[in-house]
Swiss-Prot record:
Belongs to the bacterial ribosomal protein bL25 family. CTC subfamily. It comes from the Bacteria. InterPro entries: Rbsml_bL25/Gln-tRNA_synth_N, Ribosomal_bL25/Gln-tRNA_synth, Ribosomal_bL25_b-dom, Ribosomal_bL25_C, Ribosomal_bL25_long, Ribosomal_bL25_short, Ribosomal_L25_dom, Ribosomal_uL5_bac-type. Part of the 50S ribosomal subunit; part of the 5S rRNA/L5/L18/L25 subcomplex. Contacts the 5S rRNA. Binds to the 5S rRNA independently of L5 and L18. This is Large ribosomal subunit protein bL25. The keyword Electron transport does not apply. GO terms for cellular component: cytosolic large ribosomal subunit. One of its GO terms (biological process) is translation. HAMAP family: Ribosomal_bL25, Ribosomal_bL25_CTC.
């Protein structure tokens, strides 16, 4: 899914200026990367808030329009208000289509309900890590990675090497020869 966000350069910076922006329905943010100086920006709160609720937004290639120019960006970080449903700040990183990006991608468990551990042994599959850090070209970044648990039995430990990565996507940990555990399979307590 493609996301498009309108942004404007913000001149005033600091706590007071950020509060005024938020009262006007805007979010202070920053755009950096691609060999450019960081640019202080403001984006519409409603657009970003509802987009952040979608898991795919966090790994999507976003078209950010700034001063009539469109840049390809990814969300690098964001801060939420401690108790209100309000985004406080967002960081965008500009990316180039031909340069790999390092990003954390969500991990999904699939076929666990069909596994011997769950069906026959009354067990469950528990994720130890909900995301996996990968390196890929911006166009190849997956929305999520699947961990197939169809063949697991109670007591199994699933590692990064058990994840089938799409073509053009590499695990950062596997490149360093670190085959980390990502999920465990437990049997029913007796």
């Amino acid at each position: 899914m493609t996301y498009e966000i309108q942004a404007s350069v913000r001149e005033a910076q600091g706590t007071g200026a950020s509060r005024r922006l938020r009262r006007e329905g805007q979010i202070p943010g920053i755009l950096y990367g691609e060999g450019q100086e960081p640019v202080a920006i403001a984006v519409d709160h409603k657009t970003v808030f509802y987009a952040l609720e979608k898991e795919s937004f966090h790994t999507a290639l976003i078209k950010l329009s700034l001063n009539g120019e469109t840049k390809d960006v990814i969300v690098r970080d964001f801060q939420m208000h401690p108790f209100r449903r309000e985004v406080q700040h967002i960081d965008f990183q500009a990316v180039k289509a031909d340069q790999p990006v390092r990003i954390r991608v969500p991990l999904h468990i699939v076929n666990a309900e069909n596994s011997q551990a769950v069906k026959l042994q009354g067990g469950r599959v528990s994720l130890l890590n909900t995301t996996v850090e990968v390196v890929a070209l911006p166009a190849n970044i997956p929305a999520f990675l699947d961990l197939d648990c169809a063949e697991v039995v109670a007591g199994d430990i699933l590692h990064l090497s058990d994840i089938k990565l799409p073509e053009g996507v590499e695990s950062v940990s596997l490149k360093r020869n670190e085959n980390l555990a990502v999920a465990t399979v437990t049997g029913k307590k007796r």
